[in-house]
A protein has these predicted regions:
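Short, glycine/proline-biased beta-turn/loop segments that scaffold the active-site neighborhood
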Residues: 1-3
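Mid-domain, small-residue-enriched loop/turn segments at the edges of structured enzyme/sensor domains
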Residues: 5-9, 14, 20-124
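Flexible, active-site-adjacent loop/turn segments at secondary-structure boundaries
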Residues: 6, 16, 51, 145, ...
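Charged/polar, solvent-exposed surface patches and flexible loops
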Residues: 12, 16, 31, 41, ...
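Structured C-terminal helix/loop/strand segments within mature extracytoplasmic catalytic/sensor domains
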Residues: 97, 101-220
Length: 220
């Protein structure tokens, strides 16, 4: 979102964060409602377990690659990537392994399935807000080669992806979670997390597509 503009509506930020996976927009929204602690309190109040929100993305991302705290000079992906490239490879690899072992800002598949169930059942927000979020999750074009690629014709998929960068081929996070609805209107939550993989992006995506096909076969 930033630095092209400095003023956004909440809905514009939601579109950027959910549909386009804009971390800056997500951070702005989270700060508006009280920060990571407020999100955690909300989840706990809804009996959502095994899902942790501890930091803003601007705190998480530099740590993943062994960088210093985020600064304005790194705005934009090109500037951030250039700064990351100055970190020795061994430092980046060590930081990534530390990140993968860190329980902060993590979720288990079981915890995420619970969160998705609450979302699908309308327990987390008002009906209008629930519909808006699910609509944005369906509208995303990100991760079309992951779980969505394994779903049958006529199915819809409200989902969101997560992807970290890599250090010498080691990928810390490759995720896709959501709710798929089959043509007969049956809905199911699905969560796929992959960490510490050295496979290519295409190989990881193909694995997720296979997982979705397996899930569809399992539910008949």
């Amino acid at each position: 979102a930033w630095p092209a503009r400095i003023s956004y509506t909440v809905d514009e930020l939601l579109v950027a964060a959910v549909r386009d996976s804009d971390n800056t927009a997500a951070d702005v929204l989270m700060k508006r409602i009280g920060g990571p602690g407020a999100v955690t309190a909300c989840l706990e109040g809804q009996q959502v377990t095994e899902v942790r929100i501890d930091r803003y993305e601007r705190e998480v991302q530099p740590e993943v690659y062994g960088m210093a705290s985020f600064r304005a000079a790194w705005k934009g992906s090109a500037a951030f990537d250039a700064a990351m490239a100055t970190v020795p490879l061994a430092t980046r690899q060590a930081a990534m392994r530390t990140y993968m072992a860190d329980p902060r800002d993590s979720s288990t598949p079981r915890g995420m399935l619970g969160l998705l169930r609450h979302l699908d059942e309308g327990d987390l927000m008002t009906p209008a807000s629930t519909r808006r979020l699910l609509t944005l999750m369906i509208a995303t074009t990100l991760g079309a080669d992951r779980l969505k690629a394994g779903l049958p014709k006529g199915a819809s998929f409200a989902h969101t992806t997560g992807t970290s960068g890599a250090a010498a081929g080691l990928n810390a996070a490759f995720n896709d979670v959501g709710i798929f609805t089959l043509a007969d209107k049956r809905s199911y939550a699905i969560a796929a997390f992959l960490t510490g993989s050295t496979a290519t992006d295409a190989q990881r995506a193909a694995l997720f597509a296979d997982l979705a096909r397996t899930a569809v076969r399992a539910v008949g």
